[in-house]
Amino acid sequence: MPFSLGQRWISDTESELGLGTVIGLEGRMVTLMFPATDENRMFARDDAPLTRVIYNPGDIIESHEGWSLKVSEIEEKNQLVIYHGIHTETGEEVSLRETLLNHNIRFNKPQDRLFAGQIDRLDRFGVRYQSQLLRHKLATSDLLGLQGPRVGLIPHQQWIAHEVGQRFAPRVLLADEVGLGKTIEAGLIIHQQLLTGRAERILIIVPDTLRHQWLVEMLRRFNLRFSVFDEDRCVEAYADHDNPFYTEQLVICSLELLRKKKRLDQALDADWDLMVVDEAHHLEWTEEEPSRAYRVVEALSEVVPGVLLLTATPDQLGHQSHFARLRLLDPDRFYDYQAFLKEEESYKEVASAADALASGKRLPDEAVASLTELLNEKDITPALRLIEDESVDNEQRDQARSELLQELLDRHGTGRVLYRNSRASVKGFPTRIFNAHPQTMPAQYKTAARVSDMMGGQTDLTAKVKQALSPEKLYQAFESDSASWWKFDPRVDWLIDFLKNHRSKKVLIIASQAETALSLEEALRTREGIQATVFHEGMSIIERDKAGAYFAQESGGAQALICSEIGSEGRNFQFASHLVLFDLPLNPDLLEQRIGRLDRIGQANDVEIHLPYLANTAQENLMNWYHKGLNAFEQTCPTGHILFNEFSEELLTQLVYRDEDKFTQLLNHTQSRYKALKKAMEQGRDKLLEINSHGGDKAQKLVENLAARDQDTQLIGSVIRLWDIIGVEQEDSGENAIVLHPSEHMMFPTYPGLPEDGITVTFDREMALSRDDIALITQEHPLVQTGLDLITSSETGTTSVAVLKNKALPAGTIFLELIYMADASAPRSSQLYRYMPPTPVRVLLDKNGNNLSQNVSYESFDKQLSAVNRHIASKLVNASQTLLHPLFAKGEEFAQAAMKQLTEEASNKMTQQLTAELERLEALKAVNPNIRDEELEHLRNQMVELGNYLDACQLQLDAVRLVLVSHA
């Protein structure tokens, strides 16, 4: 290499040293000083890993004094370069000797890095390009926000999320029956709103007892890190902001906290995009006097654009309560209860017409008349003829029915604000089989009860009932630690025998109290060595996760999981199908919650419910009231809490004093009321609303598309390569799972989201659903998103040099592969990414400037290439410089033309889609007042905004690869 004092060079291996100056030449050695870091380096002249820095006309360079010039001419004098050009601020002609260049130079542009010898490994170029393609694919996916959550692909849940999550500021009531997954629906909507940029600040308001359950659910299922706010947290947050709610973007708090005027005022001032209210049916309202809780939520709903209310089914609550929820969503629309009742009468005609269409049977004359009147603004005669014409094939007739149903749906009074699924309308639930196992009351319990009565015992009726239902607690209270109830309780003997006879089965056991659960685990372990684990409210989230994972493990895992009532809230174990109720809760909703741990959509087997109970006791009476009065073991009972409230006094009395005749009378009354309520609910079912809520064939198609994405092996390969390049340690742990650990040789100092102690992940949704301790990896997972960001926001893979061994081409032939990014920068909330996300544009040039990218795919080209070491690569670049400069200019011409085509296509697609949606909503507004003016105005503004962003689209070179043909 020809060196001369004062020349500027850069180190190929230590680019962070900045620009070096030759300060010494002695024999075979050359010494460089790097002023930016105040360090010197000595190199062998013949093979120094150095690259001469010479800029080209058009480059903007900076002097060590801080001013810049645009190079127009280069002069070489005594082996040193002088740059002539125009001062960027004054416009004067100036010159700059290379010795006076800024020392802190960084080569950010790929072409500058290439010519400066900062050449990356071949595989990193590939990972960078694949990362850009992956980001583009995700941004343009019509399933964005639905694939990432660790939830089962349940059609009605995904459908509601798809429909609601894509709206601007959705205001919706989610009122599915228990067990159908309202929390999951809300989580999917939240996840989608965040990923699509429609929402950034979210407030979830829940009952105090459910705060941590929601926190865990949002993190475990949706990878969303919410913060729980209570009074202490608010006080702590004052150090960072006057308004504590501004210190976090995603917040969970209780309604109790917001009852305080100070906290409510702060929440009202916190600029939320979306508010979610769980258990909204507890907000009491009357026209004369709304409750304080209702007024709190009402105040927030007036300032927060998006509102999701999670509530029990309207049938369970009565019309006035239902109207109160709708009023929170749209007070202008639902302004008067009496007017709402009148309007509901008109819904019945719509629902009847929908029933007739959905039945698939011949339409009666009154249905035809109703349809014609309801859809009077368009001619539906051709569709009606098709439906009635038996010579037409079934597919065409079904299509006609479907189109008319859609027309009715669009006109349905609450179809856009209310989603309500019932078990009657959703398929996929298992059969529930109830098995009662009577046991003899032990003498020890009888003695304890007698002693308690003699000592005065409990006087409160409810306390007496609890004592009668849990004799083991009364016994243990007398005996303290001197004896253990589980050593003689026949229910424990039955449980041990049952587990021994079903060794291959996973069994979930639920008891009311944590103490009972711990005692049962001790009994199983000490008496028979049965592998069981406990799950109760005293355990941390991590401890519960470990217990759940131990139970879920197929080989070597626990046979039984013993849960307390509170500890099992929000956890589901569909992989088990045997449920043992060691005792019974004094609440039908809690009983349903217990059974719901196994009786979920996705349960592959019948659910066997086992109840060992003490015969001729309060336990038997309560079992009979649930089973014979409500059929609560084998069917869900949405009216259970209504019946419990009606008959609670009689029931509690009979549980304590046990009069056979009076109890039989109570059972008869309960059965009659149960049948009457069930019939009323069945008659009140709104089939049209159900069709809208579960999505039918469209929902099925949606989950099929999601399932197909889960099977994308290309994604798995890309993610594994991404982690390889970054330097993440990957260890196969069997069962389709991988353990990821940070390594000492990672490319980046930190990898946000990757814990120091590692994380177990899987690409298999079923595996992730069965194991709470395993993360589901999709392209939406934060670990994937962060990995892509680390690569694409750094200089990794921006330059590469490779050799193409192909004797059909002359040796020394060059190809220049250029990857540009076409980017119309815009806020994520604008939704521009749906039409024009940052898009990779590939150009492959031969030495004559011909673009071969249409004929030579990236994959086929990449397979033929071999890597070269950095030093040789730098020499090859220097030897090809004169050929490369005009090729870069030519490449930009091709990329500009491609970008113009992309923006035109995006503009056409955007205009077409938004105009169609706007026209549809404007037409609907004439027949359905639930279309809000804000939605229409938002669409109009969005079209103008997006057009402006597309006009400002920019092109930037992202990566470059030089390829030389070799025959060696």
Curated annotation (Swiss-Prot):
GO terms for molecular function: ATP binding; DNA binding; helicase activity; hydrolase activity, acting on acid anhydrides. Residues 491-645 form the Helicase C-terminal domain. It comes from Shewanella loihica (strain ATCC BAA-1088 / PV-4). Gene3D superfamilies: 2.30.30.140, 2.30.30.930, 3.30.360.80, 6.10.140.1500, 6.10.140.2230, P-loop containing nucleotide triphosphate hydrolases, Tandem AAA-ATPase domain. Transcription regulator that activates transcription by stimulating RNA polymerase (RNAP) recycling in case of stress conditions such as supercoiled DNA or high salt concentrations. Probably acts by releasing the RNAP, when it is trapped or immobilized on tightly supercoiled DNA. Does not activate transcription on linear DNA. Probably not involved in DNA repair. Signal peptide: none annotated. The gene is rapA. Keywords: Activator, ATP-binding, DNA-binding, Helicase, Hydrolase, Nucleotide-binding, Transcription, Transcription regulation. PANTHER family: DNA ANNEALING HELICASE AND ENDONUCLEASE ZRANB3 FAMILY MEMBER, SWI_SNF-RELATED MATRIX-ASSOCIATED ACTIN-DEPENDENT REGULATOR OF CHROMATIN SUBFAMILY A-LIKE PROTEIN 1. Residues 163-332 form the Helicase ATP-binding domain. Interacts with the RNAP. Has a higher affinity for the core RNAP than for the holoenzyme. Its ATPase activity is stimulated by binding to RNAP. The keyword Protein biosynthesis does not apply. ATP binds at D176, E177, V178, G179, L180, G181, K182, T183. InterPro entries: Helicase_ATP-bd (IPR014001), Helicase_C-like (IPR001650), Helicase_RapA (IPR023949), P-loop_NTPase (IPR027417), RapA_C (IPR022737), SNF2-like_sf (IPR038718), SNF2/RAD54-like_C (IPR049730), SNF2_N (IPR000330). This is RNA polymerase-associated protein RapA. Its EC number is 3.6.4.-. It comes from the Bacteria. GO terms for biological process: regulation of DNA-templated transcription.
